[in-house]
Amino acid sequence: MIRLITLFLIVEGAGLLAQETTAPLQRMPLGASGTLPADTVILAQRAAAAFAKKDWDTARAAYQEMLSLDQENALAWANLGAVQQQAGLAKEAMECFEKSVLYNPGLVQSWNALGLLYSAKGDTYQAMSMFSRAIHEDPEDARAHNYLAITIRSLGWNAAAESELQRAIELNPKFGIAHFNLSLLYMDQKPPSMELAKLHYKKAQSLGVGKDEVLERRLAE
C-alpha cells in the first residue's frame, strides 16, 4: 500500500459548512495513483512522523528530497502540497497540487485540494471546475460531491447542491458532514423543509458531527 497525506480544510459558503476530521495519512490502492520514488521508505516514514507532529520543515525537506530523486512523482508533489497548505503557504501548496495532477491527472485528492484552495481564495468558478474534475476522475468520490455542493450552493444553485449532497450520501451513507450540509440546505429553503432538516441533522449527530447551536435553535422554532 502507498500513503498520501490528505488535505483537510474548513470551507464556508452560503450557509453550508464542510468540515472533516483531520487525519494525517490515508492509504491509497496500489497502482491507483502511482507510488513514491523507489528506495524512499525511510524518507516517507520521516515525513509521516513529522506531519503528525506538525513539524512542517522536516516533512517538507523529506518530500523535497524525494522529488530530487524523481521530479515527476505525482504522489510526492501531492504530499508536499499538503505540507505547504498545513504550514499556511497556500500559493506554494497550489503549485504543488498543480504539479501533482500534471504528472497524474487521476489523483483525485489533488483535484479536491485545488478546489478547496481556490474556494478559500474566493474563486468559486475555478473551485467548481476542480471539484468537477475530481468527480470526472472518480464519480464515486463522496467528498468531491460534498465539496461541489458547497461551491454551487454559494451561487444559489440549490437544486443542484441538493442533488450533489444526496449523491454523496448515496455513495457513503455514513458521511456525517454531508448529512449536516443537507440539513442546512433544507433549513434555508423557502419555506424551510423542517422535517427533512431535522432528519438529516439527527443523522449527522449520530455519525459523530458536533452540535450546532444556531441550527438547533432554528430547528426548535
Question: For the regions a protein language model found, what residue spans apply to each?
Answer:
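Structural marker of alpha-solenoid helical repeat scaffolds
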Residues: L69, Y103, E137, L171, ...
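Structural signature of tandem alpha-helical TPR/SEL1-like repeats
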Residues: A52-E65, Q86-K99, Q109, A120-R133, ...
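Alpha-helical segment of the N-proximal tetratricopeptide repeat
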Residues: A38-E72, N79-Q86
